[in-house]
Amino acid sequence: MKQRIVTALILAIVAVCLILLAPTSLFASVLVVVWAVAVWEWTGLIGMRAAQVRIAAVLAVVLAQAGLWSVRDSSLWWAVLVAGVIWWPLALLWMRRYTFSASPTSRNKAIKLLAGLCVLVPAWAALVQLHGETPDGRLWTLFALVLVWAADTFAYFAGSRFGRNKLAPRRSPGKNLDGVWGAL
């Protein structure tokens, strides 16, 4: 536990310095690397085991991010941001109907991969936009990420300490309502 806390503190200091001091181009580039790791993890979580498929997914996201960066002042950039906003309520409705823990068929894995990409690419664009848009963009980026980090931390500790009532046992068995209240 001590090593986990020290690692978290070091990463937090690096992240805060990156957010507050780095130009948006460097911030975006570092996020590309973080997102590549996230895609690799996501493909593993959804049951994709073939390394070449996972690498292809990572490359697809990196290329999408590079392409978006090259058109960041265009309507395509804004279309991706709007699509990301529209995606979230649709995903919530979809999760009520679709069982993500369904049989691990190729089709289900492809759907899960697409769902992850619909979250990750717009989220990257949103953070980059927030960071570079206004003179206070760096502070707003820090505020947004601290809010997420705090909610995640409080959810973890509240869920670990008090968690009895499962939130969605078939989709995410470790999540519970007490964690939700801790996050809020």
Regions found by a protein language model. Give the residues of each.
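Membrane-embedded alpha-helical bundles of polytopic integral membrane proteins
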Residues: 1-184
